[in-house]
């Protein structure tokens, strides 16, 4: 992923957050002084890894990206990890990291069009579907769903989760008439400024379920309400959209836009909603982490910056890369571009921790959201960690994209919960092949590395 991006004006959407640049400076956190002699971050090791995926013709152009963890309430040992593989479709794994089901991405609609490309995935629990006509049941069924952004077609894809289903737990229940998320037509889809990042959210007040989708190479985020149809499928409607800024006023009074390929804006990918108060956290890859109401009605606040924030860059057409200039020192100290996967770790005492993948330096940062604090309070940095090799054949996570965490007992393998992280450079790999995959980490190791286990014991 290119570390710097250029900006050009985007089409207006329902909510715009591109007001006076000076306002952005006030909303962003003050630059932190570099830490001298800081201790190395603690390391945790994975317990298991999935088989490598290969982004080439032989491997079906499969490229690991984003995971989600589904807990089987009847048999936690049979819980599942559902993960995107881009043009390779969806993969479903057991807790042993072995493949349970593989679903292909949809084919290209025409010879000159892009095929389906599953980018990000998240879960919805207990959505009520229409009555099942195949069984003549009059009662509506509730179902857990895996919702995916299909970047290739600019649509959401929705799969029902049923662990007892012969042939695999996932069934596609996407309404064939489901609309495109951002694009007006196929020509616009082919430009690939399409649905990209994803987070799901069920409003506790109304009971309605939503997906929030970001737009590739743009700053837009769309709120989409998930709607069951009479035929038992699921569609969605766009409620509103919001545009994050693409240009920023720095503390020295100068303006800055992240450098990137011509015509591209600084995009968002990693997103997660805290269901306790309906707060959306969104990672603008080359900028930092934003906080905003998940209904997209309020003003976004930049709560942490990437280290590269404010660094000027010049795009080189020959190399197709950005050459960075002198660092003015306005960036943060916790995450390096790209800021990628975001996940929420809830504790038993009600505290919540936002985990962020710092792709630029192969680390993960944790931010505390304390019980009883106002929603407007910024998350507080609580530590970080690395996922490193457990052995010569079980490597760690590098250039991590997506991540998912579940702090609930998952049977005998993960009684203290599970963290799943993407590995952007799975090794060992055959020479000349790009290998990716997912690492499964015992959550107790992560909580110990962050000091959460000791804090929980002290509170008891």
Question: Language-model features: where?
Answer:
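Secretory targeting and sorting signals
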Residues: 1-33
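Sequence/structural signature of beta-propeller domains
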Residues: 4, 33-460
